Regions:
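Flexible coil/turn and secondary-structure edge motifs
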Residues: 3-6, 20-200
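Bacterial N-terminal signal peptides
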Residues: 8-19
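N-terminal leader/targeting segments
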Residues: 2-3, 14
Length: 200
């Protein structure tokens, strides 16, 4: 009976340890990228359709104002950028590949604007989480600048991530929740079609 109890406890311990280890391994597979490429509704809609991306959260970072509201950010006075924080499985997609999509999905040569969205809150920016991301971002920027893919000079900034403030709930999954909204129909949808992320 004692032997049985010991074996049962050992088995339970091994199961708990296995589950903990599996969860820890899964967490180690997840990396986060924080990018500014114009309106965060667009950035979110693009990356939500990329294989290997687990979650995308719209928010604000890069400024000094604490807990900014959308109204404050779009005033252009907070210094914050509309950004998307992208959680991805690095066994399926790399940070390098995330940046490739970033370059393709917006115009990194227009200073403080994307299309009709104008202001410092729409600036092109890569916010790195660690030294490895910083090095990859700098190399990627250099490669794109040297490749002359873009006619004009790239103005994307590479900045250390400080505090990321999650945007209000109504901004999250905006395209999915408001597919018929004018901005979605005339701005986001054409972008998704151009990138072959949605069927015509």
């Amino acid at each position: 009976m004692k032997l049985f109890s010991f074996n049962k406890l050992s088995l339970m311990f091994l199961i708990i340890l296995f589950n903990f280890t599996s969860s820890e391994e899964k967490l180690n597979q997840i990396e986060i990228a924080t990018l500014g490429a114009g309106c965060f509704w667009c950035v979110e809609a693009v990356f939500e359709r990329i294989d290997g991306v687990i979650d995308v959260v719209s928010g604000y970072t890069g400024g000094k104002t604490k807990n900014p509201s959308y109204k404050e950010v779009i005033s252009g006075k907070t210094g914050h950028v509309e950004t998307a924080q992208i959680s991805f499985d690095k066994t399926k997609i790399s940070y390098d590949q995330i940046l490739e999509i970033f370059w393709l999905s917006h115009d990194p040569t227009t200073l403080n604007r994307q299309g009709n969205d104008v202001g410092t809150q729409y600036r092109s920016a890569i916010f790195f989480h660690n030294l490895n991301q910083k090095n990859i971002a700098e190399r990627s920027l250099k490669e794109k600048s040297n490749s002359k893919i873009f006619k004009n000079r790239i103005v994307t900034t590479i900045e250390k991530l400080d505090i990321f403030y999650e945007a209000e709930n109504y901004h999250q999954d905006y395209f999915n929740n408001n597919p018929n909204a004018p901005y979605c129909q005339y701005i986001i949808l054409p972008k998704l079609k151009k990138l072959n992320l949605i069927q015509n």
